[in-house]
């Protein structure tokens, strides 16, 4: 065991299994010790640096020596470098098979046996499906170019520009490129979490999957000096499939790397979009919770309604109901539906959505 006090560099590992959340499992050494390596899949042979953490061994992926036979060419040019996606190098059917096995293994390990496995209902959309994205400002290396996108894999600081992201509508990519181009022409720097310098933090974009309505939220510190009026004009001049209905500037002077608002100023339009789910209308504000895969959410909620059944004398409680999406969708299944939520803003949004949909019970 003393030999594992330090890292075993460049260890060759055959990946044979998967563990939750995206950890490949292999074995190494004469004693055939188990090791997990993030972002690997069964069938790959990888080179990793292995280190003991508590009672387990973890490997940091260095390179993939041999691909799995079933791997495909990723649709996104940034896959492998960008930390946003995990399984673009396999088919969606293979991804679902992996996830099925992982879930069943978790249930087995927990000793749960008295259940009926009903299979997986796939998402109707597997590209351009996300209705919300939080992008980070940063650089592509030490003192590198200003970037706006997702964190690099295995990095807490470096950023990959997501100007052609495969999981969002092209409208969102156009907005990102416009914002990045604008600030590259200024003296503004990204907010450095360790030095606490710079002003540019995040770009939060929401786009209604069924309506095409879009709100764009720029998040900076209060140190921002650049006039934002030209940026607003540039965004509104974009040729989009949908329509920008709101642009806001959010001020966040906190040290944590999260999107929150100390102050919010609407620069154009409004701070919400409207979208639909199973025929109902929903007002979705900047910080509202709403399932990020809209078409997948319809499959999910239809299944919930099916499992709940219909009864004229039934009272349904929706715990942790958020903005009341499921609560309202279940209203036609019961005499009365009661949503329970601790976040006051979400409760107020739920009340507004209930009025929009004319729901009385």
Regions found by a protein language model. Give the residues of each.
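Rossmann-like S-adenosyl-L-methionine
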Residues: 1-12, 18-24, 225-361
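Short, conserved phosphate/pyrophosphate- and ester-handling motifs at nucleotide-, phospho-/glycolipid
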Residues: 43, 168, 293
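Short, aliphatic-rich beta-strand segments
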Residues: 205, 212-221, 281-285
């Amino acid at each position: 065991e003393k030999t594992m006090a330090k890292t075993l560099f460049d260890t060759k590992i055959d990946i044979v299994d998967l563990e939750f959340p995206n950890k490949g499992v292999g074995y190494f050494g004469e004693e055939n010790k188990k090791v997990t390596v993030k972002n690997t899949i069964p069938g790959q042979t990888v080179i990793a640096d292995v280190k003991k953490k508590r009672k387990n061994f973890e490997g940091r992926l260095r390179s993939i020596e041999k691909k799995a036979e079933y791997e495909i060419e990723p649709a996104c040019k940034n896959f492998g470098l960008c930390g946003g996606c995990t399984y673009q190098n396999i088919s969606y059917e293979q991804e679902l098979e992996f996830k099925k096995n992982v879930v069943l293994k978790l249930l087995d390990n927990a000793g749960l046996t008295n259940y009926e496995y009903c299979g997986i209902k796939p998402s109707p959309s597997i590209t351009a499906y996300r209705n919300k994205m939080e992008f980070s400002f940063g650089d592509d290396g030490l003192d590198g170019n200003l970037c706006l996108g997702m964190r690099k894999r295995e990095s807490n600081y470096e950023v990959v520009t997501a100007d052609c992201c495969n999981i969002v509508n092209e409208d969102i990519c156009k907005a990102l490129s416009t914002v990045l181009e604008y600030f590259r022409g200024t003296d503004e720097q990204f907010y450095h979490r360790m030095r606490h310098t710079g002003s540019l933090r995040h770009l939060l974009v929401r786009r209604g999957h069924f309506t095409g309505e879009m709100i764009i939220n720029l998040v900076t510190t209060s140190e921002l000096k650049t006039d934002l009026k030209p940026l607003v004009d540039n965004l509104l001049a974009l040729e989009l499939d949908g329509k920008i209905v709101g642009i806001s500037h959010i001020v966040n002077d906190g040290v944590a790397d999260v999107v929150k608002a100390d102050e919010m100023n609407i620069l154009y339009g409004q701070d919400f979009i409207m979208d639909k789910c199973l025929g109902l209308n929903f007002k979705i504000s900047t910080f509202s919770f709403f399932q990020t895969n809209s078409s997948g959410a319809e499959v999910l909620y239809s299944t919930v309604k099916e499992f709940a059944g219909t009864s004229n004398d039934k009272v349904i409680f929706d715990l942790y109901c958020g903005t009341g999406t499921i609560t309202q969708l279940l209203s036609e299944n019961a005499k009365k539906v009661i949503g329970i939520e601790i976040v006051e803003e979400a409760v107020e949004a739920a009340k507004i959505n209930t009025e929009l949909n004319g729901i009385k019970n």
